[in-house]
Regions:
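RNA pseudouridine synthases
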Residues: 41-44, 53-61, 70
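Conserved nucleotide-binding/hydrolysis micro-motifs of P-loop NTPases
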Residues: 54-56, 71-76, 130-131
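Short gly/ser/thr-rich secondary-structure transition/capping motifs
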Residues: 28-32, 47-51, 105-109
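Conserved phosphate-donor/acceptor-positioning beta-strand/loop module used by diverse small-molecule
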Residues: 60-83, 89-99
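Short, amphipathic alpha-helical "lid/cap" segments that border enzyme active or binding sites
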Residues: 35, 132-140
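ATP-dependent small-molecule kinase phosphotransfer cores
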Residues: 1-46
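Small-molecule kinase domains that catalyze NTP-dependent phosphoryl transfer to phosphate-bearing small molecules
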Residues: 1-17, 88-133
């Protein structure tokens, strides 16, 4: 499943349409299953969903706090490097860059919105400046006041 996470469908134009006339591509089926699972979970209980374009999927849910935590590239690389002993800083930077590109493409393809656009969220927090613990406190405070 991780292989397909935050990917956009491959399109091969007319040739693909000949073979997929009755079938959705696997990526589209996974996107639909992900949307259904997120909506189902959010409609039955309090939960925290990280990523997955959930701010878009849950945009019509009234009691939903859409939070965007962001930080500078180098800070994120250093943080990830601390969780990946034995992996070079260059490789971690490459992985972070690749993940950013995949998230942007996924967001734009499936939601038709701009990736990292503050207008899509209720609360945006710079974890590089605030720190993780402080950001968590802000989120908890905001959630209690919904």
């Amino acid at each position: 499943m991780r292989k397909w996470d935050e990917r956009v469908p491959n399109t091969f134009g007319f040739a693909q349409s000949l073979f997929d006339f009755y079938n959705k591509p696997l990526d589209e089926e996974l996107w639909q299953a992900q949307m259904d699972a997120i909506r189902e979970m959010a409609s039955h209980e309090s939960c925290v969903i990280v990523g997955r374009n959930s701010e878009y999927i849950l945009r019509e849910f009234d009691h939903c706090l859409r939070v965007f935590a962001h930080a500078g590239f180098q800070w994120r690389v250093n943080r990830m490097a601390g969780k990946m002993p034995g992996v070079s800083l260059e490789q971690v930077a490459s992985d972070v860059r690749q993940a950013d590109k995949a998230r942007k493409k996924s967001c734009e393809h499936y939601t038709k919105t701009r990736y990292r656009d503050a207008a899509n969220y209720d609360l945006c927090l710079n974890t590089e400046k605030l720190g993780i613990d402080c950001a968590v406190k802000f989120v908890l405070e905001a959630a209690e006041n919904l």
